[in-house]
Amino acid sequence: MSATGLRRLGFIVAAFVLQTARVRAALPGPDEAPARPSLAGQLLVAAPWMGDPRFERAVILIVKHGPGGAIGIVINKPIGEQPLASFFNALGQKNGDVTGNVRVFSGGPVQPELGFVVHSPDYRRPETVAITDRLSMTSSIAILRDIGDKRGPAKVLLAFGYAGWGPDQLEQEIEERAWGIAEADPTLVFDEDRDNVWDVAWKRRTQNSYLEIPKVRIEGSGLQQILSRP
């Protein structure tokens, strides 16, 4: 890897460490609840007529949705594979017996230096966030070491960057039919061939209108904010 690549990788890994603190600080208290139906834990599926080329055929797992806006991770835009050891080498850390590669995804156009690991719920750290009862997310360099040491979750999706919407922006885009809504089936999130994810998700969409979303609390939708910005 080039010197430039190592510097960028080091910056990305450092962002993992910073992100851990941000995720924990952003968690709501036990009495907080969404004021309206939340899409947290569901999939956004870009309509075939999506006008934004950044989201053409994109499938996005929504991890936060509330009055302040929404945050999601694109799950079907792989950008390559990276040796797990390189994340630690870039920071000058001992990588021990960490072996193997991890597939890396572009999670969205916002802050691509930030890393997120979406994973199955069989793994948990203090900073882990439950998106649903079948999907979790951890933003910590420690999870990469555990994956390399064969102590990590059974299913993993590592993404850098995210998609973000301001207040009422996502609702408006859904009303304009830019997005369909589908269940976040873990098989679709982790196992389906990435070239097929959009086709399968589009066929499975259950709502095309925000107004059609059942007014029930979705598991994990109490997450009011994943990121805090200065």
What do these predicted ranges mean?
Residues 10-19:
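Bacterial N-terminal signal peptides
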Residues 1-10:
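Bacterial N-terminal signal peptides that target proteins for export
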Residues 25-230:
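A short aromatic-anchored loop/beta-hairpin motif
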